[in-house]
C-alpha cells in the first residue's frame, strides 16, 4: 500500500483486537467482532496459520492501555487501526492490489511499529471501482450486522432448505451439451454500463434463463452499484427456480456468507484481488460447513498462483477485465491456463469459469479451447428482449433441455 512504511518487526504479542504470534501460529482479529466470528471452525493451514476469536482479550487490552491513554474509545480505535496495518502488510506481501480501507492517519495517541505517510491529497480516494465497492462494503456490513446478528443468522441457517449442487450442475451441463456450463447472471445494472434492463423482473429473467438451458444462475445482491438486492436472491429461490444460485456479492466478512445462505444461496463469490490467502482459506471452511460452493475469482497470473496454493478450491473464475484499465481481453483466459497453472488445474479436476467479454459463439469457442468448462455471462443475454433466444445466440444453437 502506497505510503505504508513498516518501521520495525512484528512484536511478540499485540493485545486484541490484533495479530499476535505464538510458537507455531498466528491469530488475526479484524475488529471487535473479529473476522473469525465462528469459534467452532478451527483449522491449521499449511503455513501454520490459524484464526480464532479472542473476545475476552479486548477487556484486558482496554484495562492495560487506559493508564497511558485516558480515552478508552481511542484505545480501541488504535488497536483496530493497528491490526488493519498488519493486514495491509500481509496483503502487500501477497500482491493484493485492492486496499481494504482508506489509508487514513493513525488515531490520536498512536505509537507503534507503523508510520503512515500520505504522499498526496488523493491517498484516501479509491483507485478503482472494485476498491470503492470494497470500502463501501465494510461500512455496509457493519450496519447490517447490527440488524441481523450472527447468532440469529446461525439459527436461521438451521431452518433453511438444503443447498443444491452448484459444481455438479456445471459438470452435468458440460457433459450434456458439449459446451461450457452456463452461469447466467441476473443483473439490472453495472457501474461501467449503467442500466442494462429497464423493465427488470428478476424472477421472470431467472425462469427464462432456466428454460433457455442455464446450468446455474448468478444473482447480483449489491444495491448501490448494481441495483441488485438479497430480496432478488430470495424471490428467485422462493419462486421454485431449480438452477443452483450464486450469490454475487463482494465478500469482506464471514457474516455475509451466513446471510447469503439464509437468503437461498447455493454458492458465493470470493475475489482474490480483495482477500488474503488466509482469509480465503477461512471462508472456504465456512462455506464447507454451510454446504455452499465457492467461486474464487482471479484476474492475473499472480492471483492464479495464489489460489492454486490453497486447498479445497473446486471452482476458479478468470475475470477478463483488467483492474487497472477496465479493458476486457478474453485472451487473458488462455494466458492464465497455459503452462504449469493449466497442468495443476487439469490434475486437480477443477472447473474454470470464464468471465467477462463473452458475446458470441466464437468467444465461447475460444475460452472453451483454452480449457474452461463453464462461463458466467450477464450483459450479452440480460439485455435481450428474449433471454432464451439470447442464450441460443450466445452458443450458436439451442442448449435447453427440450
UniProtKB/Swiss-Prot annotation:
- Reported EC number(s) for this entry are 4.1.1.48
- Give one Pfam family: IGPS
List the keywords (alphabetical): Amino-acid biosynthesis, Aromatic amino acid biosynthesis, Chloroplast, Decarboxylase, Lyase, Plastid, Transit peptide, Tryptophan biosynthesis
Q: Identify the enzyme class.
A: lyase
Catalysis: reaction(s): 1-(2-carboxyphenylamino)-1-deoxy-D-ribulose 5-phosphate + H(+) = (1S,2R)-1-C-(indol-3-yl)glycerol 3-phosphate + CO2 + H2O
Q: What Gene Ontology terms for biological process does this UniProt record contain?
A: L-tryptophan biosynthetic process
Cite the annotated pathway. Answer: Amino-acid biosynthesis; L-tryptophan biosynthesis; L-tryptophan from chorismate: step 4/5
Q: Name one GO molecular function term.
A: copper ion binding
Tissue specificity, in the record's words, reads:
Expressed in leaves.
Q: One GO term of the cellular component aspect?
A: chloroplast stroma
Q: Which family does it belong to?
A: Belongs to the TrpC family.
Q: What does this protein do?
A: Indole-3-glycerol phosphate synthase required for tryptophan biosynthesis.
Name the record gives this protein: Indole-3-glycerol phosphate synthase, chloroplastic
